Amino acid sequence: MSEQYSNDFKLNAAMAAIVLSGGVIGYAKSKSMPSLIAGSVFGLLYSTSAYYLSQGNSKVGLGVSVLASSLLGGVMGKKAIATSKPIPIILATGSAFTLLSSGKELYNIHKN
């Protein structure tokens, strides 16, 4: 793995774990299938991003990260504004940070 993208790898692996565990916890607490499905889908996207980054395919890894972060940020941002609950706020903030980090690196790749 390129040392240049190791922070993006760690960030995407952490987001995968957070989102997947959040979906499982949401299902366990309230039998929420949407939480389980969304947590699984976004966890898989972030895991895919981390995998490609670990294999040195930074364009694909960062692209998947930007996609996942954009979608999750939009959904959770809307929910955070509507409910002011902490979990949507945390997920919206985490996805925004991941989007900025991965987006900046992807921009730098395409700029050069």
UniProtKB/Swiss-Prot annotation:
Localisation: Membrane
State whether keyword tRNA-binding applies. Answer: no
What are the alphabetically sorted keywords of the record? Membrane, Transmembrane, Transmembrane helix
- InterPro entries given in the database record: TMEM14, TMEM14_sf
* Transmembrane residue ranges: 9-26, 36-53, 60-77, 87-109
A cellular component term (GO) from this record? mitochondrial membrane
Instruction: Look up keyword ATP-binding and say if it applies.
Output: no
One Gene Ontology BP term is:
regulation of heme biosynthetic process
Give membrane topology per the record: Multi-pass membrane protein
Please give the superkingdom of this protein's source.
Eukaryota
Family per similarity comment: Belongs to the TMEM14 family.
What is the official name of this protein in its record?
Transmembrane protein 14 homolog
